Amino acid sequence: MKKLLILLMALSLIAAACGDDDDTDAGDAGSDSGSSSEPADDSADDDMADDDMADDDMADESHSLSVEEINVAYFREWPTPNQFGQEDGTFDEAVGATINWLPFSSGGEMSEAMLAGDVDIAYSQGLTPFAGAINGGADLKLVGIAVSYAEADNCVAQESLGVTRDNAAEALAGATVMTPFGNVTHYKMLSMMEFLGVDLADLDIVQAEGGATTAAAFETGDIDVGCAFGGSVVTMLDSGGNLIMTGAEHESDIGIFTYDIVSIPTSFGEAHGDAVTAFLAATEDFNNAWAADPDTQNPVIAAAAGMEDVGNFLGGELWFDFPTIEDQLGPDWLGGNVAAAMQGQVETLNELSDGDPAIGDFAGAVDTSYLEAIG
């Protein structure tokens, strides 16, 4: 557990310095290539310069996006490499548009904001709330995988309960469990309790209003089990809590794989597909740059994520994995398993809580065209 706590604390430092757009010159098209003393030659040079400027203007137009600003939903205390360019505007420059970073506390809120027209791209939205929205008829598309993680999303029990895998059914009887509803944390909690033989009727399940609220309630002893993600998990462990099961056990024993996605309103993709592709391409570039020099970038990313005091969140061995575009398009992700995972999650939520019956086929909600358009 001590090793896992160290790993958990490692997950917390990656912060990004991102925000103001740096103005860049559109480029002088000067073609001062001749110093002839004859007027006729000067005129020819001027004509050539004019032609070069026209060519540059055309090039600028061909590389400009169909939008000047993109509203992107993201989570605080959830560090990702693209936050390295969030405050200094370098990510904006890589995309080719001003990025308005809008913080949200849940994936469900992200779906609602996209449907309301307030968000163009939801970055690192949980798969479960997205699947729930699709199951409810929302016209959204899953266009990429943001991050894969296991240990970063979990349930922490008060040490005084002495919960183990073997005694969970008895030790958790009558326990107060705080969790968000309708997201992957909720799905993992329900699946874990079923796997451990815990009767949900024996639990007092309270809806969380955010990870910080859950961590605070855990620290004061108002709840017995807190389920959250990111820095809130670290905070609860720092308060003396214990994991009921590790993320690795969720994967190996229950078959739960935890990852977040990139999603868009279908209408935004149809109108501004170039912007979606540019965002995904820039994110890939920033992921690669972080992987090449994480020690330099992690403190900057941590500051952007508001996690300076939580430790090196991205420094852990297995905290976050950022699949490449090639991997995302493969059968383990957008090529097949993602649609099946959405089906399974919706069915589980419907069976173990008050969810709607699954629609039967989620493949239509997955659109690989934007990733495929990246050269």
What does each model-found stretch correspond to?
Residues 14-17:
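C-terminal motif of bacterial Sec signal peptides marking the signal peptidase cleavage site
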Residues 60-208, 217, 224-230:
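Short, glycine-/small- and polar/acidic-enriched structural segments
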Residues 213-304:
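Pocket-lining segment of extracytoplasmic ligand-binding domains
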Residues 19-38:
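Bacterial lipoprotein signal-peptidase II cleavage site
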Residues 132-144, 235-250, 309:
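Ligand-binding "clamshell"
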Residues 34-71:
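N-terminal low-complexity, Pro/Thr/Ser-rich intrinsically disordered segments
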Residues 342-375:
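Conserved C-terminal helix/tail region of periplasmic/extracytoplasmic solute-binding proteins
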